From Swiss-Prot:
Localization per record: Cytoplasm
Keyword tags: 4Fe-4S, Cytoplasm, Iron, Iron-sulfur, Metal-binding, S-adenosyl-L-methionine, Transferase, tRNA processing
EC number: 2.8.4.3
Gene that specifies this protein: miaB
Annotated organism of origin: Burkholderia ambifaria (strain ATCC BAA-244 / DSM 16087 / CCUG 44356 / LMG 19182 / AMMD) (Burkholderia cepacia (strain AMMD))
Protein name: tRNA-2-methylthio-N(6)-dimethylallyladenosine synthase
Catalytic activity: N(6)-dimethylallyladenosine(37) in tRNA + (sulfur carrier)-SH + AH2 + 2 S-adenosyl-L-methionine = 2-methylsulfanyl-N(6)-dimethylallyladenosine(37) in tRNA + (sulfur carrier)-H + 5'-deoxyadenosine + L-methionine + A + S-adenosyl-L-homocysteine + 2 H(+)
The keyword Ribonucleoprotein appears for this protein: no
Record: residues binding [4Fe-4S] cluster 2: 157, 161, 164
Length: 457
């Protein structure tokens, strides 16, 4: 009987990518297949996030629930990976003695060896070292389902924002060689991938050697241009970027590379220069707006999403008003916004914070309501327009319909003859938008033909 692995992922898209790689590593080494049911698993892995306290505590809550599974199935192995593992290390085993494996983002490729050592010794294995970019040299070729895929281009972050644990849990910035990234993307394209999302904590800082050991360096704009030249790749996305390193070279890429989507996730974190300085973000609101102004001069239809932190220590009502003014001016399409969560070991954790939580919550609700109004307005403005979408598969709500995404990341559901589904999935097609809903759009396919290629015209 085939053994199975269950992975629960917390946090960012980098973690989603890493979770897929955990499955790939265990499949290549031991033949394990992924399961969506922990009860069926022989190995249960939690890929964790420590950006906010709530996410960190949820890991231990979930660990408590799977403890019963281990008691009923003694051979079951339980592992904790990701940023909480990097931060807590062996203390995870002290707190939850039934955990067998603790590994960081940079050591997931060592899972098979750690499992062997655990079985041989009977003791929990902990490896949270930072062997730089080593893991990419030991990962098997990517296995993908569907026309979209993530590709990690670098690891870590060297910005050391005052509130953020990422540099401490993932290490400083290290870029993959250009050739390595291009080889992975080309392999994905051969499997039918049409859209890649280039991943990094700060992709703007990408500085990859042209080949392993080379002294010649490619910047992020160069990488995008090379990816665009790979046959089969029709869309390029990336996340996450940092305003401080959004160079003119990268801005110019929006004019040179049509395959680069007109959607940008550019975290601003706050709209007050005073708070941005306390956060050690390294830019002003004016500098941030200047980047967006230049981009929209090239791509007037650019949609913009961001991250925002409400209730940072010392935030006044005036600071919050400046944040809201920026939200209105930028017309954000989406925002991942949260109340500030102090993280142990970061400089901001020592700052005096005298703002009552109920005030922070009220501000967050106001911010999120405003963003939701923006989202609804933008969705309504798309009704009646023809949108180019990448068909990803059957609709979740109705398997008789298909679903795809627009450039600005809207889900579009549309009816299509069942016989046409296999040839439409993975194609770029035109859909006329008829209805806008809170979290999706509905449209109609403009052309259905017996010729699969005709679906892309």
């Amino acid at each position: 009987m085939t053994k199975k692995v269950y992975v629960k992922t917390f946090g960012c898209q980098m973690n989603e990518y890493d979770s897929d790689k955990m499955v790939d590593v265990l499949n290549a080494a031991e033949g394990l297949e992924k399961t969506d049911t922990p009860e069926d698993a022989d190995i249960i892995l939690f890929n964790t996030c420590s950006v906010r306290e709530k996410a960190q505590e949820k890991v231990f809550s979930d660990l408590g629930r799977v403890r019963e599974l281990k008691e009923a199935k003694p051979g079951l192995l339980i592992g904790v990976g990701g940023c909480v593992a990097s931060q807590e290390g062996a203390s995870i085993v002290s707190r939850a003695p039934y955990v067998d494996l603790v590994f960081g983002p940079q050591t997931l490729h060592r899972l098979p060896q750690m499992i062997d050592q655990r079985r041989a010794s009977g003791r929990a294995q902990v490896d949270i070292s930072f062997p730089e970019i080593e893991k990419f040299d030991h990962l098997p070729p990517a296995r993908v389902e569907g026309p979209s895929a993530f590709v990690s281009i670098m690891e870590g972050c060297s910005k050391y924002c005052s509130y953020c644990v990422v540099p401490y849990t993932r290490g400083d910035e290290v870029s993959r060689p250009l050739d390595d990234v291009l080889t992975e993307v080309a392999g994905l394209a051969d499997q039918g991938v049409r859209e890649v999302t280039l991943l990094g904590q700060n992709v703007n800082a990408y500085r990859g050697a042209l080949t392993a050991g080379s002294t010649e360096i490619a910047d992020f704009a160069t990488l995008i241009e090379y990816v665009a030249d790979i046959p089969g790749i029709e869309r390029i996305r990336y996340t996450t970027s940092h305003p401080k390193e959004f160079t003119q070279r990268l801005i110019d890429t929006y004019a040179k590379v049509p395959k680069l989507v007109s959607h940008l996730h550019l975290p601003v974190q706050h709209g007050s220069d005073r708070i941005l300085m306390a956060m050690k973000r390294g830019y002003t609101v004016l500098e941030y707006k200047s980047v967006i102004r230049k981009l929209r001069a090239i791509r007037p239809d650019l949609s913009l999403s961001t991250d925002m932190i409400v209730g940072f220590p010392g935030e006044t009502e005036e600071d919050f008003d400046k944040m809201m003014a920026l939200v209105h001016e930028m017309s954000y399409d989406t925002s991942f916004s949260f109340i500030y969560s102090p993280r142990p070991g970061t400089p901001a954790a020592n700052l005096h914070d005298d703002t009552p939580r109920e005030v922070k919550l009220k501000r967050l609700q106001h911010l999120q309501a405003t963003i939701e109004e923006n989202v609804a307005r933008i969705s309504r403005s798309m009704v009646g327009k023809v949108e180019r979408i990448l068909v990803e598969g059957p609709s979740r709500k109705d398997p008789n319909e298909l679903s795809g995404r627009t450039e600005n990341n809207r889900v579009v559901n549309f009816p299509a003859p069942l016989a046409s589904h296999p040839r439409l999935i993975g194609q770029m097609i035109d859909v006329k938008i008829n209805h806008a809903y809170p979290h999706s759009l509905r449209g109609e396919l403009l052309l259905v033909s017996d010729d699969a290629s005709a679906a892309t015209h």
